[in-house]
Amino acid sequence: AAFALPAFASFEKDVITPAALEAVLNRKAPLSNIMMENDAILNVIANVKTVISNPVLEEALLKTNHGVNGIPCGESCVWIPCLTSTVGCSCKSKVCYRNSLDN
């Protein structure tokens, strides 16, 4: 049987890669007055996003052919907005992207 990647919408939760998680943890939200510990942040993220490996997400992005939207941030946004918005990502076509022209 052939291995097929599920569509983003077939996941029960949105997905995020370990690299995207690290970027979120390393960046403090500008409007946050409460400094949460990394463990607490990870618990919150685990309730709303499923952590998947980078190659799985990259393969899914290649199959959807939405490369013109920018640089993938390693996160989907089917149900939950981009957590990586703190590092400049935004939701386009159910995937969080960073504008390739921004530094």
UniProtKB/Swiss-Prot annotation:
PROSITE patterns: CYCLOTIDE, CYCLOTIDE_BRACELET. One of its GO terms (biological process) is defense response. Residues 10-69, 100-103 form a propeptide. Disulfide bonds join C73-C89, C77-C91, C82-C96. Pfam families: Cyclotide (PF03784). The keyword Zinc does not apply. There is a cross-link at G70-N99 (Cyclopeptide (Gly-Asn)). Residues 1-9 form the signal peptide. Keywords: Disulfide bond, Knottin, Plant defense, Signal. This is a cyclic peptide. It comes from the Eukaryota. The presence of a 'disulfide through disulfide knot' structurally defines this protein as a knottin. Belongs to the cyclotide family. Bracelet subfamily. Probably participates in a plant defense mechanism. This is Cyclotide vibi-I. It comes from Viola biflora.
